[in-house]
Each structure stands twice: as structure tokens, then as C-alpha cells.
């Protein structure tokens, strides 16, 4: 009888200890999940939208933190190629994403078109431009565009000027910015008379107005691709974030900031 009691007590003690170990393991697992960080490299034009997207994604994945790195798509591409930590890349141009694809840096099947945009000419208060030909007149001294080699918006702007036979006439007035946000700031601050930016950048900007929207046939299609990086240490969570951005909820948020749903 005493032996039976001892065996029962030992069994209870062992069971309790196993329960404690299981709870500890579960707690450690939860803590690890809480510390999951996704590094997102995104085009500068997504700055405002990313704030709301991050908040909404937090409701879906409360244990995931987003570390967002904003900049010119070309600069972000170079950082990724040089080994900078990145789980998800969102580019404002296909050229940069295709370069990473060709180097085998993207997770297979994740390179998708996230959204589209429009290119507009913005002007400072007091400037009146009805058509692009006005850029050649004496009262327009500085035209801001992104650096065409590294800033997709700058590439599109140069295409517009080339295809309307204006580039040679206005190239002496061009001032090149490191990204599209700097173009917008220069016009807002009066450091440039006009500038080419995305519709999403001008959408709620103060101190400027949209002079005109460029014709789609004067520049390449403005598509924003998204992809998960092959070297991501959190591929499942990265794919979950990509899926969220492509979902109806993610697309609705992006549309609120002037972006358009990809066809």
C-alpha cells in the first residue's frame, strides 16, 4: 500500500514537472514569435501608406514587427545586393526588381505586381502651367525630377520629356533629387518651380498643386512589384505580409493614398 502511494506521488510530481516544462517551452516559443522582425525595403513614395499598412498588419500578426527602410528603389536594390537585411522588397519600378531576379536573390513565385501609379507635374503656389510646353518658357527656372538612373519616377519623367521632344530644351533647368520625396519637398519649399512626382505623393501634400497628369503613352507603365527575398530568415511571415498587401484590405488602404490596383 505504501509502495502504491509512493508511485502515485512520484507520478504526480513527474506530471507536474512535465507540465511546467511544456508551459515553459510554449512561453519561449511565444517570446520568440513576439521578437520576429520583418525588414521591409520600400520605395519612398510608400512612406505615408506604410504607416497604416503596418498598423493593420499588426492586427493580423500581433507578434510581428515591421522595420521599414524607405528610399529610392535603385538605392534599395544596391543595398540588397550588398547584403543588407531584407525580407520583403517593394520597388517603384520593374527594372530594380528584375535585376534582383536575374541574380537569383528572390524567393521563387513571390515576384508579383502590387500596384500601379500615375506621374503628375506639381507646381508651387503662384505657378500656372496648363501644358508641358510651358516648361520651356523663361519664368520656369528649375524643374525637379528624381535621378533617372536610381529613381523610377525620374526615369519616367525623362521618358515624358524625351517623348514630347522637350528634353533638349529644358535639360539645363533640371535639378536631380535622390528620391521622389525630395522632389516634392523642393517644390513645396520653393527651391524648384515644378517637379514630376507620383499621384500618390501629391495626393495629400500641402503647399503644392497638381498642374497636370502626364499621358500614359509618354512613359513606361508605372508598376510597383513586390517580392520576398530568398535569404529571408522569416519567409512564412514575409509571405504573409505580401499576401496581406495583395488582399482586398491591403489594396483598399493603398487606394486611399492615391495608388491604383494592378490589373
PLM feature spans:
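Sec-dependent N-terminal signal peptides of Gram-positive bacterial secreted proteins and lipoproteins
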Residues: 1-27
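Periplasmic-binding protein-like
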Residues: 87-91
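Short, glycine-/small- and polar/acidic-enriched structural segments
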Residues: 110-117
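Conserved beta-strand core positions
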Residues: 38, 64-66, 119
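Exported/periplasmic ABC-transporter solute-binding proteins
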Residues: 23-55, 74, 78-81, 93-94, ...
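Basic phosphate/pyrophosphate-binding loop/patch that engages nucleotide-derived ligands
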Residues: 105-106
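Signal peptide-proximal N-terminal region
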Residues: 55-67
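Conserved strand-loop elements at the edges of beta-sheets that form or border functional pockets
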Residues: 70
